[in-house]
């Protein structure tokens, strides 16, 4: 059985390989702008900015694009005033959906989201409706083929402050408290591991979906991810691995 994390990884790989890579850049630039505006333009003293810049570098964003986005955030260059807004709701099958958006027009974003929720048989809900289902956590991912000694990896991660390690899927996931993410990441990198790190929201419980509901959920999540204003989408669905792959193949085909 797999859930939101597997879907997100598949979606990210597809976007990185095709013409939608520009959407990744658009979202990352917005994140850099807002992070620099809120915490300053120094990545050494601004953890959120450092994380955004590291993700941009991992996607091979040109250095000048990153620097320009930082300057827009600090006010050195003129830029759009993006606001961070959280939206909550339910997808088909009672699946909880938690959306983080960066927008220059909250009314437009709310209207577009309401349209998508209605189109795919979900419902946009009030603030607090589903946020209690999710926990904010740091997540470090390592490709399984990069790990020669799983026990050694576990020992390093635990000693550095990791809370949990999920090694049943690829990539391997190391879960931390958000404030410990940088420390655990640094220790793993010092040990020679290539890692990707992010702060995310993990569901405390899941809802299994199958058949038409499963297809509608994945189609809906894809549509949400394709919105320029939407930065991150989190959900608590669970479905059979094979069924997910078959549905995604049809949707992307």
From Swiss-Prot:
Record has Cytoplasm as a keyword: yes
Disulfide bond annotation, renumbered to this chain: none
UniProt keyword annotations, A-Z: Cytoplasm, DNA-binding, Transcription, Transcription regulation
Pfam families: TACO1_YebC_N (PF20772), Transcrip_reg (PF01709)
A cellular component term, taken from the record's GO annotations: cytosol
Similarity comment: family membership: Belongs to the TACO1 family.
Subcellular location: Cytoplasm
Chief location category: cytoplasm
GO biological process, one term: regulation of DNA-templated transcription
Organism in which the protein naturally occurs: Thermotoga sp. (strain RQ2)
Alphabetized Gene3D superfamilies for the sequence: 1.10.10.200, 3.30.70.980
HAMAP family on file: Transcrip_reg_TACO1
SUPFAM superfamilies for the chain: YebC-like (SSF75625)
GO MF, one example: DNA binding
Protein name per UniProt: Probable transcriptional regulatory protein TRQ2_0469
